[in-house]
From Swiss-Prot:
Region entry 2 X 50 AA approximate repeats, spans: 499-627
Top EC class for this record: transferase
Localization of this protein: Nucleus; Nucleus membrane; Nucleus, Nuclear pore complex; Nucleus envelope
Phosphoserine modifications at: 111, 116, 135, 145, 155, 162, 327, 358, 376, 392, 534, 607, 671, 761, 1068
Lineage: Eukaryota, Metazoa, Chordata, Craniata, Vertebrata
Post-translational modification: Polyubiquitinated by PRKN, which leads to proteasomal degradation. The inner channel of the NPC has a different redox environment from the cytoplasm and allows the formation of interchain disulfide bonds between some nucleoporins, the significant increase of these linkages upon oxidative stress reduces the permeability of the NPC.
Protein name, UniProt field: E3 SUMO-protein ligase RanBP2
One Pfam family from the record: Pro_isomerase
EC numbers, comma separated: 2.3.2.-
Organism, as annotated: Bos taurus (Bovine)
Record SMART domains: RanBD
Region Interaction with SUMO1, annotated ranges: 552-627
Polar residues bias spans: 139-155, 460-477
Region (Interaction with UBE2I): 499-551
Residues that bear Phosphothreonine: 18, 158, 479, 609
Amino acid sequence: KQKFEECQRLLLDIPLQTPHKLVDTGRAAKLIQRAEEMKSGLKDFKTFLTNDQTKVSDEESKDSRAGATTAADVSGAPNTETTGPTLEWDNYDLREDALDDSVSSSSVHASPLASSPVRKNLFRFGESTTGFNFSFKSALSPSKSPGKLNQSGASVGTDEDSDVTQEEERDGQHFEPVVPLPDLVEVSSGEENEQVVFSHRAKLYRYDKDAGQWKERGIGDIKILQNYENKQVRIVMRRDQVLKLCANHRITPDMTLQNMKGTERVWVWTACDFADGERKIEHLAVRFKLQDVADSFKKIFDEAKVAQEKDFLITPHVARSATPRESPCGKMAVAVLEETTRERTDLSQGDDAADTTSEVGGVSGTPEPTTKAVVSPPKFVFGSESVKSIFSSEKSKPFAFGNSSATGSLFGFSFNTPLKNNSSEASSAAQSGSERKVEPGGRQESQNSDLKSASDGKVKNTSPAFLKEQFSTSHTFKTPEKVEERKKPEDLPSDDDVLIVYELTPTPEQRALASRLQLPPTFFCYKNRPDYISEEEEDDEDFDTAVKKLNGKLYLDDSETCRLSEENVTDNEKECVIVWEKKPTVEELAKADTLKLPPTFFCGICSDTDEDNGNAEDFQSELQKVQEAQKSQDENIASSADGMCTDDTKVTVPFLCKSEEPEFTTKSVSSPSVSSGTVDKPVDLSTRKENDADSTSQVESKTVTFGFGSGPGLSFADLASSNSGDFAFGSKDKNFQWANTGAAVFGAQSTSKVGEDEDGSDEEVVHNEDIHFEPIVSLPEVEVKSGEEDEEILFKERAKLYRWDREASQWKDRGVGDIKILWHTVKNYFRILMRRDQVFKVCANHVITKTMELKPLNVSNNALVWTASDYADGEAKVEQLAVRFKTKEMADCFKKKFEECQQNLLKPQKGQDSLTAEFSKETNPVVFFDICADDEPLGRITMELFSNIVPKTAENFRALCTGEKGFGFKSSIFHRVIPDFVCQGGDITKHDGTGGRSIYGDKFEDENFDVKHTGPGLLSMANRGQDTNNSQFFITLKKAERLDFKHVVFGFVKDGMDTVKKIESFGSPKGSVSRRIIITECGQI
């Protein structure tokens, strides 16, 4: 009872999971209410604590803890791991020694001794604590219900009291389930009493008979299972992840595996499959990745059939297991899980067993045996052990990075306040510290830092702070990574699992350079790669060689030589040939020196262009020719003073400088003291003489100034400030006008240049629209036929066509283009044709019949609707069409023309007698048929052919009746008879309506449609479309206007309509004939 009350008080004092939130009165009341509700769960604790056997176990546990200190004692967690997950309830030790107030001397790990256990008080708001620490650890997800504690303090998950949840973990409300569900549901796959004989990953297909192709059924492990009891064998395959059945049937003796054509890794068979729950015959195929797996499947399949007959178990195929699939979590997550499991199970054992010379916490002992357990992925949770480590009042541990705490911290470091040295054992342990060595597999191993190895006794101090006997109040930081770097490679323990394939090592020069620049030693190792190309290295050997062959040089040997002055260049240099050099005159040199400009600054301002250098003739000789040509010109042309150009550079001629374009670099710059007072006209350099005697052109070089009396310190700011609104360089001329003003800037040049070589001209080719290019290969012209060549356009307007979609019950666009009404002048029929814009695809193509009726659309006055058998898609299809024009006048015009075409078709049609009187002539040939039905004579049919209207068609029929071409209608049959419609025959090749042959070859064209199908007894040609006539024909049994303009009428029954009626009696609506109707004899009368 006393123990139960203590447990109840502890439960009431459970701290919040979010310590940053203050507890208000309402929250406290809720906690008290929940504690009362948890009394039912405490019954299990009371039973556990009052059990005598449990007390004995507690005493034994205390004795074992007195002999050995493990990492689990710090957090109160058990040293032995169990399969149950760690819960927050495990953080509170409910044993008697947990309430002891005595505090023993703690070590670096702060492990309490069994003789003087540390009281594990919980944090309470308002109470002061002696220390504060913070640690990261891999907390485990809590279970639904609080588990029982075993004898060692481990939490064992139970199925009882599952409705009691940890309310402190969340701030939300608690919802009770409406229907309680059991915690554990037994999953049964139906394969429990069967052994897996074969299992491998494959892809399954089934044959779809409707589509006529193989379709994928699923991907997964296909298994061959055998029942232990009845020895029955079946094939089961489930899809990956969803585990849905895609194959489930038994293997019967009559099943056979066959290879699919084209591949040997695919097996095909037929079975009664139950994958969908019902019996269904399926044609299945399975494809494996490797050939040997496919062969193994075949072998096991055959063995299964024999095993069922002889009633014995098959030896499972273990040569190859199921293909492993990658885990959803990555390799790093798996490594973390393995590391966490290893730390929780082996860390404390490895520390105590490996290092017997160093004491951890001042106590050595034998650890308790541990068992492996599956640990959930680590995550940080406020609660569990963290509650005690954050808000505990026990003595704090010294701060250290990398300390191997017993909590199995995943992050490997903790924040603790420094601790006073209470014992020599604790001091020595604190001075030595602990180091973490990270192995390649991710495992962390704790080693003593003052030992170099297990057999080496040399002490190695890692930090000056640890040399002191007494710890100061300041925190001490220790970085085990730096310590590990100081270790020599031979000191580190070798790992057989790591194989060094390649090591990147720098050269001594690269190492020295990296050390001087304070960079990593391998920083410049990228230069050692074979594909590395340095940008600083000159890769110009091939170019230098080529240039030296031309007595030239591409690059200078020294960068200093790039700044050679003119006086260093001599005429006798072999690698540089000076063709022509322009030197400044005395005046130009004086001007440049006055204005602090280069000596050659004023050279070539007026005449030095690109075209000068491109001429093959010498500059001086060409200049002399120009001077002589200019002497014949007018010598009275005035010129203004130009102090910027000399005799050499002032001359500008059409050959040396384009006279059509103004030269903007030839502005005259003069001083007021030397400017002319009488001549203010601009200088035309193209007409100016070289030796001009005008005094305005003779300027002393020493008196030339740039601007208004500027000295050596001239600046553009001074020019701007002294400007009074007039020109800064001389006076403004009111009559000033640029040369060639108004001329075309980008026009073609009308005159050719004097003395220019025609072959070596670099001038740009002027665009000419009359340039004509002849094709290299002449292509023949392709004649495009649209089928409208023999037709006359009666109407043509742009419109938009619609068709009525019966399934969607709405109008849909058919196309936009020109709709036409065409009249065939030869065949005498009318049709509507419309093609889409640009693509010219046919969107309407049908003949106009007298039964068609145009009706206006209800929603628009310029839209018309009609129904027709349209051939836009190549086949006849009844479509309801609508056309919309831009205006109502266009729609009325279309309707008027449409009705006129119908009136031409509705001309008084003559009956059978009138047709006979009109088309019948004595010169027309007459032929006959003798008909027999299953050897029973029916009579003779006499027919007259319209050779005067369709001579070609009539001649074909006559020749087939006489058989003069070696083949004909004799012994042929009437293969299709439809009452009240037609009697069709004439298939002299296949006798089923798919053959036929004419005397002109395979087929011939339609002649005309002058004669319509106005009544019974008319002979007409059967065809498969336009211009596909052969030997097949039909006799009409009734008026058939829908056949007009499609079939050519070439005769009529003159005598024997009673025989035709007898043939009609053997027909059917579908066209099949009940008796065999044969033409026993035929010919011409």
